[in-house]
Amino acid sequence: MGSMVSAAEQCGIHPYTEGVLTIARHKRNPISSWNPRRVQSYYAQSQSDSRLVNGRKLWKELDGMNNLNIEVFNWFWSNKLFFPLEWCERKNGKPVFVFFWGTILLTGDGKPCVVCMWRENNELRRGYRLLDSMFDANSPAAQYTF
């Protein structure tokens, strides 16, 4: 448990607690029928070449795309076997945190954040990162292609 938890903490991931977070902006997913083959992890242009990008800038770049929201996040959490394993394969020895940009939440002290999932010791974990944090090439967006 140790090294992955440390990596999550180093990446600015906070534990996900349902009662503490409130919805600031929620974009509905216009998915009429679910097809797991259409779910993908997406890296924004600003994340190429392992660059760090501020979460607010990344959010603007991803806005208008088919980003999965907290409803899908909660569905994956309840149905962990359906969460794509390949999304969590380590890149450059670092864990991959998959973010659900379709919903922006607020922490208890009003800071905007986005929820994420990752694998730790073959177990799915969840958390969130503040938008004022930096995101890298190990921080893809969960999206649906039509």
Indicate residue ranges for each PLM-predicted region.
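A binding-site-centric feature that preferentially detects glycan-recognition modules on secreted/surface proteins
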Residues: 1-66, 72-146
